[in-house]
Amino acid sequence: MQPIRYRTDLTPYNTFGLRAQARAFIALEHADGLRDIVRLPEFDRDTVLWLGGGSNILLMQDYAGLVVHMENKGIREIARSDGMVLIEAQAGEIWHDFVLHTVALGLSGLENLSLIPGTVGASPVQNIGAYGVEAKDVIHSVRCFDLDTETFVTLSNADCRFAYRESLFKQEGKGRYVIVSVVFALKTHFVPNLGYGDLAAKVAELSAGREATAKDVSDAVCAIRNSKLPNPNVLGNVGSFFKNPVIGAEKAAALLEQHPDMPHYPQPDGSVKLAAGWLIDQCRLKGFQIGGAAVHGRQALVLVNKNNASANDVRQLAQHIKFTVFARFQVELHAEPNWLPASFSL
């Protein structure tokens, strides 16, 4: 276990690039070190921050508790049968690197989730998703350290209670389970999922008449994302800032009467998912800026750190977007990233 560092700058550890410091900071390189961390005098399970890639947090002020940076690495195959492979990745693995690793192995299932920022450990928490695939579709199980019992436990896919951008780890399990690794069930044969947006056309372009592969899909997703989304290493951001709102069928029908071209996606339960980016774009908010925080000029769903944005700049901008969209569509937007501390959330 690495030594504790005090008054540590967290700017490099959050992709929006908000300036904040941690009172205490420690890097976790091996899951077994959790047993030592929980016995540190600086440890308080009510205030500790388990930090991965920092791509889904907004640090609104200095962090008064202990920050544990998950740096445990490792990928291994644990089972193979009937065209399916179970592959385990440690929580500290960079998500995109892991996806590329599985594609290089000839496995299928994660290619649509290419280039999503963050680490493997965050994928079940947020139930990350893109281009018609969600983490829940490929997660077999999640290995955790249970802070209640101070033991390692394995939670099945069903145990995780996945929903749209939700999971057990954001609800009842928040503050109890520390994710140390995730097991994914991937296919040895390629099963394309090309029904979302312009993905099929891009894959066809890249495959140039031959049979498409998982790598073609991954490359297509990367090309599309790079054309629309800013690189957080160049322009600070947390990816999609708002969740796509889900509304009732009756309300959706009323909106479609007023806006026939509105993108909408009927759900199995009868509700309808809308595109938050389209709603924001219709309010002509692309490029809108408050202080150093701005709506990205090409993708309305992304807020960026354009010029040393303060936490207050980000909050005011997000609040303005929420109010503007609600005033026009009577649809409420909810932020995807976690506000820290939570009292700042809108």
UniProtKB/Swiss-Prot annotation:
Any one GO biological process: cell division
Family: Belongs to the MurB family.
GO MF annotations, alphabetized: FAD binding; UDP-N-acetylmuramate dehydrogenase activity
GO cellular component: cytosol
Active site: R165, S240 (proton donor), E336
Enzyme superclass (EC): oxidoreductase
Record domain FAD-binding PCMH-type: where: 18-189
Gene that this polypeptide is encoded by: murB
Protein source organism: Neisseria meningitidis serogroup C (strain 053442)
Organism classification: Bacteria, Pseudomonadati, Pseudomonadota, Betaproteobacteria, Neisseriales
Enzyme Commission identifier(s): 1.3.1.98
Listed name of the protein: UDP-N-acetylenolpyruvoylglucosamine reductase
Pathway entry: Cell wall biogenesis; peptidoglycan biosynthesis
Pfam family membership, one: MurB_C
Keywords linked to the UniProt accession: Cell cycle, Cell division, Cell shape, Cell wall biogenesis/degradation, Cytoplasm, FAD, Flavoprotein, NADP, Oxidoreductase, Peptidoglycan synthesis
Biological role stated in the UniProt entry: Cell wall formation.
Cofactor(s) essential for the protein: FAD
Record localization: Cytoplasm
Catalyzed reactions: UDP-N-acetyl-alpha-D-muramate + NADP(+) = UDP-N-acetyl-3-O-(1-carboxyvinyl)-alpha-D-glucosamine + NADPH + H(+)
HAMAP family: MurB
